[in-house]
């Protein structure tokens, strides 16, 4: 009987230890305190971009000085989500933009916004769940955020009319959010295209890359803890997302923009997305780190975006 008590105590202790470690993994990876991020966000620590810092700050200040309207929706799981709506022209197409992991829309779209404004687009910059002024404390790497994206699309159609044309734009995690949205069979025909900047094709693959190559933790251990942390404390699962994008065809045309020097989401991580649509194209920016292709070659970036809009906005 004593041996049974001892073994039960050991097993119970191991379970408590496992849950404790899983909770800490959740807190570090998936939890967000939902506080305001830095004013300008974090500028990439890349010496080759030192000459672009002034341009970056100037673009951020321009966007901060633009007039906007706070708009809100309620997510499918009852979170209040906020966005910044920038109005340029009545009856103009609308760009719906999603930022990166722990990013800010001001930082991530300070350059892209200027291109869209020049094209006469109205722009909605979304604060994703658990970021900035949107509610929630769990970042799900695009799993739940993709459902939020569909809610934002429906908001725009309900507010501006059934003939409203919508362009989806996403950077990094936002790129995956957009990609995971356009494979939805029920996506409205209002969405005429999508631009994916340095996206990953699978939450599992990007977490595995970070775990193995950056933290040097074997995946059998890291993957087990991440899945447990997400499921037990974040109330979501990303396992089924692994093959979803490559097994479904996107109804919406899209392009991928990616830097070949990306150390956060390696350039090849977006290759599988091209399998979702035979007409999709990928533009590789030489020497560009994560999320800074616009700063590396502004004119080429503008050309890629404008050519895509010209081809798909009817």
Walk through the language-model features, giving the residues of each.
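Hydrolase active-site cap/lid region
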Residues: 183-238
């Amino acid at each position: 009987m004593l041996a049974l008590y001892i073994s039960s105590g050991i097993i119970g202790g191991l379970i408590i230890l496992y849950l404790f470690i899983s909770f800490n993994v959740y807190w570090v990876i998936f939890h967000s305190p939902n506080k305001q991020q830095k004013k300008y966000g974090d500028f990439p620590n890349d010496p080759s971009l030192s000459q672009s810092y002034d341009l970056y700050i100037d673009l951020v200040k321009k966007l901060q000085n633009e007039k906007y309207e706070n708009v809100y929706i309620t997510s499918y799981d009852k979170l209040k989500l906020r966005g910044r709506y920038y109005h340029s022209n009545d009856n103009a197409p609308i760009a719906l933009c999603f930022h990166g992991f722990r990013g800010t829309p001001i930082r991530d779209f300070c350059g892209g916004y200027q291109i869209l404004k020049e094209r006469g687009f109205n722009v909605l910059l979304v604060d994703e769940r658990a970021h900035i002024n949107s509610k929630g404390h769990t970042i799900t790497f695009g799993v739940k955020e993709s459902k939020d994206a569909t809610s934002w699309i429906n908001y725009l159609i309900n507010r501006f009319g059934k003939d409203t044309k919508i362009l989806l734009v996403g950077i990094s995690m936002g790129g995956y959010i957009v990609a995971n949205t356009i494979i939805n069979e029920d996506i409205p025909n209002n969405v005429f295209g999508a631009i994916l900047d340095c996206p990953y094709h699978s939450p599992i693959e990007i977490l595995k890359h970070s775990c193995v190559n950056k933290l040097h933790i074997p995946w059998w251990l890291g993957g087990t803890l991440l899945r447990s942390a997400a499921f037990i404390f974040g109330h979501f699962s990303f396992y089924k997302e692994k093959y979803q994008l490559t097994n479904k065809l996107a109804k919406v045309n899209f392009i991928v923009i990616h830097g070949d020097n990306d150390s956060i989401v390696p350039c090849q991580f977006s290759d599988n997305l091209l399998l979702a649509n035979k007409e999709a194209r990928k533009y590789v920016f030489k020497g560009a780190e994560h999320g800074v292709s616009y700063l590396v070659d502004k004119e080429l970036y503008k050309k890629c975006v404008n050519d895509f809009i010209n081809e798909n906005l009817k």
